[in-house]
Design a protein with these regions (language model features):
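Conserved interaction-surface patches within small, structured recognition/assembly domains
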Residues: 47-48, 63-69
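Non-catalytic terminal segments and appended small domains
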Residues: 1-60, 74, 86-153
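Small beta-strand-rich domains/subdomains or short beta-sheet motifs embedded
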Residues: 68, 74-77
């Protein structure tokens, strides 16, 4: 697992740096998507997350969910044109999961991409993700990631 300023980036995920999201390839043509550790730190304590409806088709750059914290309300944008085939019901009942487990229990939606070959070039992993987020954090003048009690990545 890579780490930048106490912000964790698991090696087995793909990232879209600008949207501050991760994608996990499920090996069946679907991807789970969620917010990065950096995004959950920027948002602060998340109090609500509402995903778009299952079955909805979303275009790259559009919102798949809205997240609300004490200091921020905003969209979670998808880097892939896709159909939302599932949403994480656990976070609908307890949005703090996005803070305590952004990469494990905190997936937001499951996507079935329709233009993966055309759009996957914007996703990064490994050293490219690390360098991309270093630049992102520097440009946004972000310090260290903050982890809640019980944080498990």
């Amino acid at each position: 697992m890579a780490e930048i300023n106490n912000c964790l980036l698991p090696d087995d995920l793909q990232y879209h740096v600008e949207y501050n999201v991760w994608l996990r390839d499920n090996g069946d043509g679907t991807f789970d998507m969620g917010m990065t550790d950096i995004a959950q730190t920027m948002a602060g304590a998340v109090i609500h997350c509402r995903a778009k409806a299952v079955g909805k088709n979303v275009k790259k750059g559009k919102s798949v969910a809205t997240v609300e914290s004490g200091k921020w309300v905003g969209p979670v944008k998808t880097p892939l044109t896709a159909e939302i085939i599932a949403s994480n019901q656990d976070i609908e009942g307890d949005a703090t999961i996005l803070n305590t487990s952004p990469y494990k229990q905190g997936w937001i939606v499951r996507l079935k991409p329709s233009l993966l070959e055309e759009e996957k070039g914007e996703l990064v992993s490994g050293e490219d993700a690390l360098e991309g987020f270093k630049t992102y954090m520097s440009e946004k003048e972000l310090g260290e990631c903050v982890h809640c009690e019980g944080f498990d990545g």
